[in-house]
Structures are given as C-alpha cells and as structure tokens.
C-alpha cells in the first residue's frame, strides 16, 4: 500500500496536535475539583468517568499522524498505570508540558539529541529530590490519606486502609462490582500468583479480559500436558459433576490446549489453563502450597502418579478463581485449616534458617500468599454507570496506597514537584541545548499544580507563584481553597506514582522531540455510489 510521509516541524506539529487533544480531555479530571468525561460505548449506556488511563485508551483520532501522537500519550498513561497503578493524569499533563516547550525550542533551532540529554539530567535530579522528601507510610491513617486523595473519597480511603491492615502489605486486594448500593469490604482466604491464562480464549468477561470460575476444581500437574488423553478421565468426571475447572501445569500446549479452547468456545467445558508459578524447585514448592490451600494433591510422575489414572479426590477445590492475562487468584480454597497453618509454620522456619536475602524474600512472598488472604472490596452504586466510574477510582486508590507503602509518601497536590524546581534550577550544563532541556523540565514541574488550580476555577499562575514562595510542605488544598501544610492536611501522594509518571512523561516527550519523519498509509478513497441505469428515472412512480 502507498504511504504518505511528513517531515521535520510538520511531523512534530502533527504529533503534538494529537497529544494535545488527548491531554486536554484527560487533564480536566485532575484534582479534587476535576470534572468527568463521557465516553460513547458501541453497546449500552455511555461511560461517565474521571480515570485518566480509561479516557486516554478510548480516544482514536481520524488523522493518522495525529493519532500516532495520541497513541504515544496512551502509552504514557498505560505504562504508568501498569507499573504504579495510578497517576496517569499527572503523567499525561507532564508529557504535554514537556513536549510543548520542547517543540517550541527545537523549532527555534535547538538540537533534539542534546535537549533530550538535558531532560534526562533534570529528571534524575527530580528523582533524587523526591527521595529526600519522602517519609515512610507507617500508620493506618497515612494509608487512608493516600487512598482518599487518589479516589477523592474519604470512605473509600478508609476502606482500603482497613483492607491493607487485614491482609498485610503483601496480601492481595481485589475490587469487584457489588450487588447493593453500598461499598463493602470482605476478607476471604485466598492466594494470588503471577501467571495468567495460557490462551485469551478462556476469558469469560471480555470487558475486563478476565476468566472468572465459580465452584472450581483444580488439577495440579508437575509436568507439561500436550495430549488430551491425559486429561480426559478427569475432565469427564468434572463435567459430570457440573463443576468448572482450572489446570495448573508446567505448560499446556498442542492437542490438549487446542481441544480445551475449542470446547470452551462451544460451551461444552468451562475452565482455564495456566502455567505453574516459579521455576525448578521453587515451582514444586509453590504447587505444593496451592495443593494444601485447595485440599488437593500435586500429580507428579516422580511420585509414581499419572494424570490419566488420577482420581477426582486428588483435585483441589475453590469457591472462586479469577485469572487475567498476568495473575491468577484462588479465593476460598477448601483445604484443611490445620494443614495450611502447619505449612505456614514450616515456611516461617525456613525463613529463620535461610542465609540468602533472595530466598528469604521469596519465602516471605509464599508465606503472605498462603496466610495473608484476599481482601475483596465490593463497590456499590445506584446505577451501572456510576458503579463503573467508582470501581475505576477504587482500583486507582488501592494501587496508589500500595505504591505509597513501597516507596513512601510526599506532599500532594503538585507541591512536591514544584519544590523540585529549586534543585533543577541549580543544574548548570556547559552546552546551551542541554541547558534548554533542563529548563524545559523545570518549567513543566509546575504543570500539575497549575492544572489542579485551573480545574478548581482559579488562576493557575497565581497559585503556582504563591506555592513557590511558600516553604516546606505548604501548598494549595484545592478542595478547601486554602494554603495549608499538605502533610498535616492529609493531602499526600505516593513517591512511586509521581516518580513513574515523570519518568514515562519525559521518555515519551523526548522520543517525540527526536522524531524527524512520520510514515502512514494513504487513506483509501471511498468509491462513489453506483449510478442508476439510463431511463430508470422515477421508476414508474410519476
């Protein structure tokens, strides 16, 4: 297919236009007085949401070159969401700010490669400054503060803090749609491991790309499964009992996987296959953990056991299993409580005796998964539209709180980044274009604060200047419209969320600045409608 190409300033201008359109739609949601965005859905009612990553992912532009820019900013939001779980709107605002200044300077003749170097130097300095400002998250109240700011809802903040207290920092918190109008917390014993479905055809919820199996039997095999004949006797028994199944094995491929997928699509079988977590001896231990938790046995050939001769009483059971592309969560495993506690005690002793930090860390992870349980937050709302928006907020708040526990907290509301201006301002480069890159980041650091104030109906420039002249943790609380000590007022951010957002923003912005040409397919012209035959005129309808 023939291609169209644009070069230089025109290429960068096109990408900037696409980025600007997405950034404008996303940035209106920032801060406690941010607004919502309505997304059209092909089926069902529109989605009213103020979640940056959901908005960014939904935008597709008609102009192919502008759409390239839109896709890049979608990547900023997605990557920030994947790593930090929150802060996607801040990352989008920062990308737009760095890019706007960057393109202005490159159009004026600055060298993009040197400007990129300056941007990277400034970002490293900001990260160091954020480290100096951070303070550990120790109390339940501090966890609640981070979650409250993220969700803009005090009740959600307290619920997440309570969930973290109950399952511990290593425990798993899942968010699901509730069946009532109230949001509730329930702690269920369960385990999560980092292995997703082997094939996306196992998905039962296509919107969330998850496979959810209620009343599930679990086949645990310490081997690769390629032949369907090995599984057939067990699956026939499971189907006869009207239950769902989960296969956890070293791998499932070939004829076995193809047959499972075909039967899943036909609706004959409802189940899923995932690879066993870990490698080598650790995999054997983790399979044993799952077996004890679910009341099953690991079918291993080294023990003289074979899949084709295994019986149903060797299988584990769980009330619910949720598998996405990266994780599997087993909820309410039906194992013997005494055996689970004995296994946990065995792992605790192994931790005490271990001399390797790496082994200790992995053992602690296993212990948390075995004894921590799963906290389930059921999000309630009066309508489905409100529930979806609320659920996205709770997910973000949960991720922000976990990020806060990992790396600590800093003053929120854009104050921490504004305080980093001074350190970046002290950076002096020998080269003018490198210095330009440093100055670009310095100017962009106040963009989130400006946007928060603007969304609250105030003059962003005045608020930025007032915060700049204040000291320490003093900042602008957009919720009350007052200048307060942000830490004391509970307006805090997780260091990890801010750091990841800035890193991704600088990375994508610098990539766009280095762009010199864009190549896209030439849109196909739609053919004109076929003409009628001569003499068809009014078709006798005169």
Curated annotation (Swiss-Prot):
EC number(s) reported in the record: 5.6.1.7
Record-level GO BP terms: protein refolding
Lipoprotein recorded as keyword: no
Keywords of the record: ATP-binding, Chaperone, Cytoplasm, Isomerase, Nucleotide-binding
Highest taxon above the source species: Bacteria
GO CC, alphabetical: cytoplasm
Pfam families: Cpn60_TCP1 (PF00118)
Locations listed in the record: Cytoplasm
Keyword ATP-binding: yes
GO function terms (MF aspect): ATP binding; ATP-dependent protein folding chaperone; isomerase activity; unfolded protein binding
Binding site for ATP: 29-32, 86-90, 413, 493
Gene3D superfamilies referenced in this protein's UniProt entry, alphabetically: GroEL, GroEL-like equatorial domain, TCP-1-like chaperonin intermediate domain
Catalytic activity: ATP + H2O + a folded polypeptide = ADP + phosphate + an unfolded polypeptide
Primary location: cytoplasm
PANTHER family: 60 KDA HEAT SHOCK PROTEIN, MITOCHONDRIAL
Oligomer and partners: Forms a cylinder of 14 subunits composed of two heptameric rings stacked back-to-back. Interacts with the co-chaperonin GroES.
Family: Belongs to the chaperonin (HSP60) family.
Main function: Together with its co-chaperonin GroES, plays an essential role in assisting protein folding. The GroEL-GroES system forms a nano-cage that allows encapsulation of the non-native substrate proteins and provides a physical environment optimized to promote and accelerate protein folding.
HAMAP family to which the protein is assigned, alphabetical: CH60
Designated name of the protein: Chaperonin GroEL
């Amino acid at each position: 297919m023939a291609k169209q190409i644009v070069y230089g300033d025109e290429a960068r201008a096109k990408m900037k236009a696409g980025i600007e359109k997405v950034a404008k739609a996303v940035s209106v949601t920032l801060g406690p007085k941010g607004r919502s965005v309505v997304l059209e859905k092909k089926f069902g009612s529109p989605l009213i949401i103020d979640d940056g990553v959901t908005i960014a992912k939904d935008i597709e532009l008609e102009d192919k070159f502008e759409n390239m820019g839109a896709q890049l900013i979608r990547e900023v939001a997605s990557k920030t969401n994947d790593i930090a779980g929150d802060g996607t709107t801040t990352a989008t605002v920062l990308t737009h700010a760095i890019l706007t200044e960057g393109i202005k300077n490159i159009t004026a003749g600055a060298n993009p490669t040197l400007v990129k170097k300056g941007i990277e130097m400034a970002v490293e300095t900001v990260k160091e400054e954020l480290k100096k400002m951070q303070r550990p998250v120790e109390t339940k109240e501090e966890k609640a503060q981070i979650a409250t700011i993220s969700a803009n809802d005090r009740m959600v903040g307290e619920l997440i803090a309570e969930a973290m207290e109950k399952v511990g920092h290593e425990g798993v918190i899942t968010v699901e749609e509730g069946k009532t109008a109230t949001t509730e917390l329930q702690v269920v014993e369960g385990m999560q491991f980092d292995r997703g479905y082997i094939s996306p055809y196992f998905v039962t919820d296509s919107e969330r790309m998850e496979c959810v199996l209620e009343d599930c039997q679990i086949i645990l095999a310490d081997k690769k499964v390629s032949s369907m004949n090995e599984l057939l006797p067990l699956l026939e028994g499971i189907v006869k009992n009207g239950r769902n199944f989960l296969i956890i094995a070293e791998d499932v491929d070939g004829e076995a996987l193809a047959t499972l997928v075909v039967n899943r699509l036909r609706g004959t079988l409802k189940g899923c296959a995932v690879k066993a977590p870990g490698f080598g001896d650790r995999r054997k231990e983790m399979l044993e953990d799952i077996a004890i938790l679910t009341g099953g046995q690991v079918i291993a050939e080294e023990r003289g056991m074979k899949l084709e001769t295994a019986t149903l009483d060797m299988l584990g059971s769980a009330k619910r299993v949720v598998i996405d592309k990266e994780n599997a969560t087993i909820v309410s495993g039906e194992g013997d409580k005494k055996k689970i506690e004995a296994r946990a005690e065995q792992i605790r002793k192994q931790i005490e005796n271990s001399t390797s930090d790496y082994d200790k860390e992995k053992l602690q992870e296993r212990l948390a998964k075995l004894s921590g349980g799963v906290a389930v937050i059921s999000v309630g709302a009066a309508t489905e539209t409100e529930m979806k928006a609320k659920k996205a907020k709770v997910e973000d708040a949960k991720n922000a709180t976990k990020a806060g526990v990992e790396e600590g907290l800093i003053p929120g509301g854009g104050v921490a980044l504004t305080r980093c201006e001074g350190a970046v301002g002290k950076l002096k480069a020998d080269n003018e274009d490198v210095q330009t890159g440093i100055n670009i980041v310095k100017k962009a650091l106040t963009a989130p604060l400006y946007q928060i104030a603007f969304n609250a109906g105030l003059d962003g420039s005045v608020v930025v200047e007032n915060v700049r002249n204040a000291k320490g943790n003093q900042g602008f609380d957009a919720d009350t419209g007052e200048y307060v000590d942000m830490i004391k007022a509970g307006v805090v951010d997780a260091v990890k969320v801010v750091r990841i957002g800035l890193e991704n923003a600088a990375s994508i912005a610098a990539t766009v600045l280095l762009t010199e040409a864009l190549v896209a397919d030439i849109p196909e012209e739609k053919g004109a409608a076929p003409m009628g035959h001569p003499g068809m005129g009014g078709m006798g309808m005169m």
